[in-house]
Amino acid sequence: MVPRNFSESQLRPEPERAPSNSTKISYRSHSSSFEADDERSSSADHDSMGPDIGSAHRDVPAQYAGEDTRLTSRKELSGWYAYGFAAEVFVICGIGSFIPITLEQLARENGVLLSDPTQPCGSSSTHLPPGLHPGSAKDSQCVIYLGGLQINTASFAMYSFSLSVLFQAILVVSISCAADHGNYRKRLLLFFAFAGSITTMLFLTVVPKVYLLGALWAIISNTCFGASFVLLNSFLPLLVRHHPKAQYGTPDFSPEFRPSSVDESPPEHSLNEPEVAVYDERSALLAHNRISSQASDVAEPFPLSKDSTSIELQLSTQISSTGIGIGYSAGLFLQCVSIVIIWLLNGTTFSLRLVLFFIGLWWFLFTIPAALWLRPRPGPPLPHTGGENSKGSRSWLAYTIYAWSSLFRTVKLARRLKDITFFLAAWFLLSDAIATVSGTAVLYAKTQLRMAPEALGLINVIATTAGVLGAFSWAAISRTLNLKPHQTILACICIFEMIPLYGLLGFLPIVKRWNVVGLQQPWEMYPLGFVYGFVLGGLSSYCRSLFGELIPPGSEAAFYALYAITDKGSSVFGPAIVGAIVDRTGEIRPAFWFLAVLVGLPAPLIYFVNVERGKKEGAKLAEIIEGFKIKDAESAGEGSRGSSIDHESGQNEGLIYPRVGENAGRGRNDI
């Protein structure tokens, strides 16, 4: 927090852009009743957050009514980070740890032994005697009967997760258009955040007799979480595009700077003049002091130099990694609190439900800062529907229909993009592996290794700590080894493959005789938890930022919806297949064969991803989509108006792409 000690008359001049032809013309939005009051006026620039380059107003022609292209502010970035701090605890502590074991425990208290249907199962800590080899535990498996089907209690949790992912995928597609067009991006984010957090708190009301209600709350909360994070991800390219470092060009974040001047002629400097404070990846977006009272608060770089990796990709990776690290830190803290609660209450089912209540409460409370600080960043009006004149159910029906039709069209066009196709195919498999390995490991530790809930929570603490370390370390590792983003992802995959392969060692007769190694002892889960977390910290940030670099500009939410469908949609299959394997064999260990294949398959696909080629193909795709939009506008009787808008401002009904003639020989500088 920086104290404000200067008046309105001391406002710094508007920053002068460095000569660069790679960024878009933009202007300050005066719209959105949904953004915080302190983000709507010039006086807001003097808040407690300190002087902020992100508040600079740029009075240039608008590309569509209500567009907000103010520079990204420190407060806005804080809002983006705040939601990660709020919601990551759900996926780390909830989905990644306590929701699966709570569902399994609730089902177990209503189940019977597979070997003796007249015998109730009891708790998971009593059904398998100490020292009993997991391979001989088939007769001790617990099952429930649901709709005439016999389901293993571990499979019940996996099936619940698969079902939640299915609904999540459908919802993500349906809301993608509302996020891309109009002023719904932030509203939907907050709606799903509060709905998901409240549903998570409702786990406190679930008792064993109504264990199916627990599955319902899990489905709703996970669906809301996934939808909210898709909306959060759609903010990332916009935050990067309008970030001062991207707009004013600071390659490698270590450029030479010159003070901006109100005069168009370059200022003359003396060698003994004090330097102007500059921004780098280690400094806040706000200057905490003024090196010279004569210098402007805003520093302007020299023209951009060519770099093998774009400024946007570096910045996107930095912001994404920081967000992941902040979220993991929150998850780590709450996980430790949860372990204490479970230990104090002796690991009862009530203690698990109480922990889930606190997870939902955390999610709810820390969403409030995001609601206050995050700007809506509205998109253009929805084409052919009358824009804001369409209201109520008809408006939402139009958004939903348009979203699905746009998805099918986007999929058809995306097939022409070689690198996006490679990446999405790899991400389909990789994200499924990430989700399935996590759930399978937790349930294996609970049912096969008889680990208590607090011990399972400790595994997650280790994984989360490693995730924080990985989120901040992989960037340094990548720089040290001079790895490209896709090579960093490949390194993560190779390490990730160690987890299922280690579990498969338990099938070797010689290893079985050792009664250790190959996940035969509970302590073995802890080092594997570290490996999982460290790898996930790198994959989460690098995959998200790499895909952001390939997205055609102006359609972020739609393409991130496709990213999320590929991500969450794939997770319908992995847990369901593992559940089927468990139901068939009575054990979880055979599922490691499936996981080993699932983790390894994405590697060759990621290997062929080329970012620079993908960016060029994205520019071509932009022109193709633009042609579709013009054709649709003409067929709706709006051809003349659409052509006028297109020629005058380069905007075409919500998809903003470079004009072919204007951008010949120009590299794209936004993601």
UniProtKB/Swiss-Prot annotation:
Superkingdom of source: Eukaryota
Cellular localisation: Vacuole membrane
GO biological process: amino acid transmembrane export from vacuole; autophagy
Compositional bias (Basic and acidic residues): 39-60
Biased composition (Polar residues): 1-10, 19-34
GO CC terms in record: vacuolar membrane
Sugar attachment sites: N5, N21, N346
Statement: the UniProt record of this protein carries the keyword Transmembrane: yes
InterPro entries the record matches: Atg22, Atg22-like, ATG22/LtaA_families, MFS_trans_sf
Membrane-crossing segments per the record: 83-103, 155-175, 188-208, 212-232, 324-344, 354-374, 422-442, 457-477, 491-511, 523-543, 560-582, 591-611
Pfam family, one: ATG22
Keyword Cell wall biogenesis/degradation set for record: no
Family stated for the protein in its record: Belongs to the ATG22 family.
Function, in words: Vacuolar effluxer which mediate the efflux of amino acids resulting from autophagic degradation. The release of autophagic amino acids allows the maintenance of protein synthesis and viability during nitrogen starvation.
Protein name, as recorded: Autophagy-related protein 22-2
UniProt lineage: Eukaryota, Fungi, Dikarya, Ascomycota, Pezizomycotina
